[in-house]
């Protein structure tokens, strides 16, 4: 049923999404160049590093709390929260590591994180800025970046890209390590 004229629709959609993400990354690179911001400067951003540590710590702490308040096992709860918005990766890894049921929950948690950022940034922009960029996690540098930029201006773009980039590098390792350790 997923095939039309012997072509897998999922494969085509995956390729289109991949090409769109590459185009978005190219646009981000061009914008950084126009703002005279180097990649080296991004990784020297101490505020971004602090936010990354805070996001990971609070995600894991929340997962521990939720595990004790519900019947979700600790390992599954921590791994669900550690997707950090990257649902195309975390769902696949968590489905392999902790099962299809928790893989689907991972998708919902990561997807809702993205939707909440898109809805909450315009509503709370007067009261919160870097907090919502941190909550966007991996999506701060791609899908949520236009919403963040439109509401907070170009000055916050390097911070958002740095947070997203660092979390994008850390997330796969975090999920694999949690699966091994827990």
Mark where each language-model region is.
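Short alpha-helical packing/oligomerization segments
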Residues: 4-8, 14, 124-131, 135
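Hydrophobic transmembrane alpha-helices of multi-pass small-molecule transporters
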Residues: 22, 117-118, 144, 172
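Entry/N-cap segments of selected transmembrane alpha helices
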Residues: 38-64, 103-115, 159-167
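Juxtamembrane boundary at the C-terminal end of a transmembrane helix
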Residues: 173-182
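Alpha-helical membrane segments and immediately flanking helix-loop junctions
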Residues: 76-116, 127-162
């Amino acid at each position: 049923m997923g095939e039309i004229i012997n072509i897998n629709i999922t494969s085509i959609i995956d390729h289109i999404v991949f090409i769109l993400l590459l185009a978005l990354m190219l646009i981000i690179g061009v914008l950084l160049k126009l703002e005279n911001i180097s990649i080296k400067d991004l990784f020297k951003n101490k505020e971004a590093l602090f936010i990354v540590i805070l996001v990971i710590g609070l995600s894991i702490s929340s997962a521990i709390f939720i595990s004790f308040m519900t019947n979700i096992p600790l390992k599954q709860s921590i791994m669900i929260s550690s997707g950090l918005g990257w649902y195309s990766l975390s769902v696949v890894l968590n489905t392999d590591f902790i099962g299809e049921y928790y893989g689907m929950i991972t998708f919902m948690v990561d997807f809702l994180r993205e939707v909440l950022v898109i809805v909450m940034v315009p509503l709370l922009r007067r009261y919160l800025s870097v907090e919502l960029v941190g909550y966007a996690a991996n999506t701060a540098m791609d899908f949520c970046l236009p919403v963040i930029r439109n509401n907070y201006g170009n000055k916050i773009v390097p911070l958002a890209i740095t947070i997203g980039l660092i979390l994008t590098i850390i997330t796969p390792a975090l999920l694999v390590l949690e699966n091994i350790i827990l």
